[in-house]
A protein has these predicted regions:
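Alpha/beta-hydrolase fold catalytic core
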Residues: 1-15, 35-39, 70, 143, ...
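Conserved HGGG/HGGXW glycine-rich cap/lid loop of the alpha/beta-hydrolase fold
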Residues: 5-50
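Active-site loop/oxyanion-hole signature of alpha/beta-hydrolase fold enzymes
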Residues: 28, 32, 41-78, 232
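Gly/Ala-rich beta-loop-alpha elbow adjacent to hydrolase catalytic centers
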Residues: 79-83, 87
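Flexible "cap/lid" loop of the alpha/beta hydrolase fold
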Residues: 88-93, 97-128
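Conserved alpha/beta-hydrolase catalytic His-Asp/Glu region
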Residues: 112-114, 128-179
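Conserved serine/cysteine hydrolase catalytic core
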Residues: 166-205, 211-214
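Catalytic histidine-centered segment of alpha/beta-hydrolase-like enzymes
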Residues: 218-231
Length: 250
């Protein structure tokens, strides 16, 4: 998988996994604020960005991540949305490499029956949406600041029916790391939908050593809305597993 690195490799490493339909640039400003203290690595997940040639499956993606973890040794992992779902499964499979993790806006496994309906009736819509329309819809829907328009426009070039179906399929294969020893912070934006908030409650109910928190006034992709706060939340959790004072405990 394609990756971008920032910061001194002698420092502790944080692996960043972006949301569906985005790419590594989602984390650019967050990484900038963390790079003095951490070695930051943002990947392009399969069928996204510069990893568009790699098939997107849960098994394949987590295997790629396992190789990346082994390369760096002990790592922290941060994932948003699709990236958060993959983080959960990676934590289940490769807990020995993960010192701590932060996930945001993540759902747990979707039912196969529901995904069949989504793949039949929702995914084909992406066949007729032009990239420039997708950019506009994403920026408006996620309240992404205008300074990110170029990055969103590039990411939207990869969005198609096959990618969307692959993402839906991946979300049927999430494995919860129930016997978890790595501190896990499960975050949701205050403006997230109920599906995400129910998943947040389910994850923290079943996964040991996990904690939930709400980000006030934040939406789904709040790494764009407030990269400084996102960086501070990550830093506090990675260093001493404390929840940022701005967040509301659940």
């Amino acid at each position: 998988m394609f990756k971008v690195e920032m910061g001194n490799t002698a420092n502790e490493t944080i692996i960043f996994l972006h949301g569906g339909g985005l790419d590594h640039t989602q984390w650019k400003e967050v990484m900038h604020h963390l790079s003095e203290r951490f070695h930051c690595v943002a990947v392009d997940l399969p069928m996204h960005g510069r990893s568009v040639h790699i098939p997107l499956t849960m098994e394949g993606t987590v295997s790629h991540l396992g190789e990346l973890f082994a390369q760096y040794g002990q790592v922290h992992v941060v994932g948003l949305s699709l990236g958060g779902a993959i983080t959960l499964t990676a934590l289940h499979r490769f807990q020995q490499y993960i010192k701590s993790a932060v996930i945001s806006g993540t759902t747990v496994s979707l039912r196969v029956e529901d995904v069949k309906l989504l793949n039949t009736y929702v995914a084909p819509v992406y066949q007729v949406i032009k990239p420039e329309w997708m950019t506009m819809l994403m920026m408006k829907g996620f309240k992404i600041p205008s300074r990110f328009k170029k990055e969103i426009n590039i990411a939207s070039q990869s969005i198609n029916v096959e990618q969307v179906r692959a993402m839906f399929n991946v979300l049927t294969e999430v494995e919860l790391p129930i016997l978890n020893q790595s501190p896990l912070l499960v975050v949701a934006g205050e403006k997230e939908n109920n599906l995400v908030k129910r998943a947040q409650a389910e994850i923290t109910a079943y996964v040991e050593n996990s904690e939930a928190a709400i980000v006030p006034k934040a939406g789904h992709v709040w790494s764009y809305e407030n990269p400084v706060l996102f960086a501070e939340v990550i830093e506090r959790w990675c260093i001493n597993q404390t929840v940022h004072y701005v967040l509301k405990s659940v």
